[in-house]
Amino acid sequence: LTKQLHIGKNFIYVVQLFNLIRIDMLTGPLKDLKKPSFSGHETFPLRYGWLTKMMDYFDPEQKKEELRKKSKYFFSTGEKITNLMADFGVGKNMVNSIRFWADKTNIIDTNSKIGMKLSSFGKLIKEFDPYLNFIPTLWLIHWKLCSNINQTTTFYYTFNYFTSLEITKDQLFKSLMQLKKDQEWVGSAD
């Protein structure tokens, strides 16, 4: 009986701790987030070689006019998107996914005066590790992806708040849906 009480006491303690963490979580950066971002990658995971292709495509040695023209291709349809598909050797949805991953890992800057260009982070990687061979480069890219609450909410939440020792799709989905409910996010997919 003493052992059962002890286990029960520990269980209650763990539940109370979890509730404190949950309350704290809702007072952290997630509390102020009004519009989470869960899409944009067209269901494609980040693939080997995509970031390198973007660094080559937006090579900083090119003239501004050429970069401006290339930047516009990413936001167009018809023949221009067909040119991009040929340049990258992928379909239309993959072109959009490549742009998404390059933006969210901060390889490209989408807010420059000329449209898209390599960010200072992208230029540094292109100069010192263009094929992403070094583990520290991959760690930095991972950190960039997981530290942007506004643009990659799932990654931010998973690596900063999700408290399970093992991650399953169902656990993560349920946890995100609970967060959506707690935060009263409207318009997020159920």
Where are these regions (language model features)?
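Short, positively charged and aromatic/hydrophobic N-terminal segments
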Residues: K9-I23
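Donor-sugar nucleotide-binding helix/loop cap in glycosyltransferases
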Residues: D24-D190
